[in-house]
Structures are given as C-alpha cells and as structure tokens.
Design a protein with these regions (language model features):
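Bacterial N-terminal signal peptides that target proteins for export
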Residues: 3-21
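Bacterial N-terminal signal peptides
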Residues: 21-31
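A structural "domain/chain start" motif
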Residues: 33-104
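Surface-exposed short loop/turn segments
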Residues: 35-62, 113, 118-171
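Generic short beta-strand segments
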Residues: 71, 140-144, 181-183
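Feature marks short, surface-exposed loop/turn motifs that line or immediately flank catalytic pockets
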Residues: 75, 145, 163-165, 184-188
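Short secondary-structure boundary motifs at beta->alpha junctions and helix caps
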Residues: 91-98, 168-204
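Extracytoplasmic/secreted envelope proteins and their assembly/folding machinery
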Residues: 104, 108-112, 199-202, 206
C-alpha cells in the first residue's frame, strides 16, 4: 500500500494552525497571570466634620445679610487627605481614610450652618449661592492636621477669619479680623477619632 505524502501546501497549513494555537494559549496564560497579580480593591472610608448646632436666638435677630466667601487653604493641606505629622518636617496621610470634602469648605459650611441655626441674622448665604450680603466673611486655613508626638495625638487647626462691610471703603471695610489656633486631644486613636477631635476643635472656633 502506498502511504500518502504531505504536500508543501498541507505542511504550511498545519504549521499555521499550530502557531495560531500557541498564540491563543499565550494570551490565555497572560490574562490569567495579570488577573492573579492584580492588587485587591480597598474601600476608602470618608469623614466629615460634625458638631451640635448652637441654640437659636431669633428674638434678637438683626436685619442684615451675611455672605460667605470661599475659604482659602494652605497648599500643603489643600486636598481631602487626612494628614498627620510628627514634627516640623514629616508629612504623611492615612492610606484608606479621607475627608469627604476639602477641609476649607467643610469648616466654612459648618460655621455658616451654625450662624443659620442661631437665627440672629436675616439671611446667611454660602459660597454656592448667588445672593450677596452686606457683610462678607472670609477665612484662611493655615494648618489642618493630626499631630502625633510623645505627648499623644492632637487635632490641630490654625486659621484666620475676617468680616468686611461691603458698603464701606478702604480700611473702614474691615470690621473684624482674628487668627485662631485650636488643639484637641484624641479620645480614640483612629481616623474616626481624629475626625471627632477635629470637629470639637472647629466647634470651639465657630462658637
């Protein structure tokens, strides 16, 4: 019996099929390797400043409107990172915990909410509202971080606040200007404990 002899065309076809099979298998193994080496996803916990509103006092309401400018913040703290420092040079943040909002906006919103709650003014407008007011409140956050040292862990806030009369001109516009430095010890050593301590510190400045 005569055995069939492979032609060059048939041989080339078999080689092509074998190459395609190897390429397909390579992609499968590569995909499996990438999937196996992928880093696991972590949930990011987000925190807000929060404190009890002061009691109302509408009996002494003043016929004036207050407008909040957007508070500024030092570049080092201008993010949602929950920053901690152990000296004048160190600078770090929690890996899986963040502020839900930029600290400058959280502080301004909290102070504005307190002023509305008191009911002492005809109206209090936030930075997002288009309405204006005669008296304009501006602020600047200079430091906002968790200090960690031998004495323990402390929430630290350093900021300045000013109030201007938009009707006046020159130096007469500035009615009030003050710098605040508030520190509050943590009662719980955790990002949540830091958020609570920072809230108490901000509350003392606001009130």
């Amino acid at each position: 019996m005569q055995h069939p002899v492979s032609t060059p065309a048939l041989f080339a076809k078999k080689c092509k099929y074998a190459c395609l099979t190897l390429i397909a298998l390579s992609f499968v193994f590569l995909a499996a390797g990438c999937a196996g080496s992928a880093k696991p996803a972590y949930n990011i916990e987000r925190y807000l400043l929060s404190w009890p509103s002061p009691p109302g006092d509408e009996a002494r309401r003043l016929p004036v409107c207050i407008k909040f400018n957007r508070f500024s913040i030092a570049a080092a703290y201008n993010s949602t990172d929950m920053i901690f420092r152990d000296d004048d040079y160190g600078f770090d943040s929690f890996n899986y915990s963040r502020w839900a909002v930029n600290p400058a906006d959280m502080i301004a919103d909290g102070i504005a909410a307190d002023m509305r709650s008191v009911g002492k003014y005809q109206a209090v407008f936030s930075r997002q509202e288009t309405a204006g007011g005669r008296f304009v409140i501006s602020g600047g956050i200079e430091e906002f971080y968790l200090r960690t040292d031998k004495s323990g862990k402390t929430a630290l806030i350093s900021m300045s606040v000013s109030v201007e009369d938009s009707v006046e001109k020159g130096t007469a516009r500035i009615l009030f200007q003050k710098k605040y430095l508030q520190e509050e010890r943590l009662q719980e050593t955790s990002p949540r404990g830091y958020a609570r301590a920072a809230s108490r510190a901000t509350q003392k400045i606001a009130h």
